[in-house]
Amino acid sequence: MKMNINLIRDILLQSEINKFIFPKFEESIYKRPKLEFLDKYTIPEVVYHLKIIEQEKLLEISFYRNSVEVRDLTAKGHFFLLEIRDNSVWEKTLNISKKISVSSLTALKDIAVQVSSSLIVNYFK
């Protein structure tokens, strides 16, 4: 499965608002949470990206037999989200990422920092 950075951003934005439990399987005893942003993704996609997010230490997540509990953003997750929260910064970050063909989370954060820095410099001109 390919990494979907928009899904990662959606999960981080939602986890800042509230915690949630997500089923690992369609037939899980846990019902899929009513989170609009997740409607466009499949359960396997969300679970896969939750694993990536957990491996990157952006969220505190517990994986159980039938579900995944998203508990809280880590400090690293908060700082990453600060860089990518604004939609205009996010769009510019994605455009630059595509132009230079890089898409790792680290690269995206670095690009977002540069985009934000550029906005700050331009503001004071």
Where are these regions (language model features)?
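Non-catalytic, well-ordered alpha-helical scaffold segments
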Residues: 5-9, 44-47, 71, 75-78
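Generic structural signal for hydrophobic core residues of well-folded globular domains
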Residues: 15, 53, 81-84
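Short, amphipathic alpha-helical interaction segments positioned at domain boundaries
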Residues: 69-100
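Short amphipathic alpha-helical interface segments
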Residues: 2-36
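Membrane-inserting effector segments that mediate pore formation, membrane fusion
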Residues: 89-125
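Short, well-structured hydrophobic secondary-structure segments
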Residues: 40-53
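Short acidic, glycine/proline-enriched loop segments that cap or flank alpha-helices
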Residues: 38-41, 61-68, 107
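A short, conserved structural fragment
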Residues: 51-64
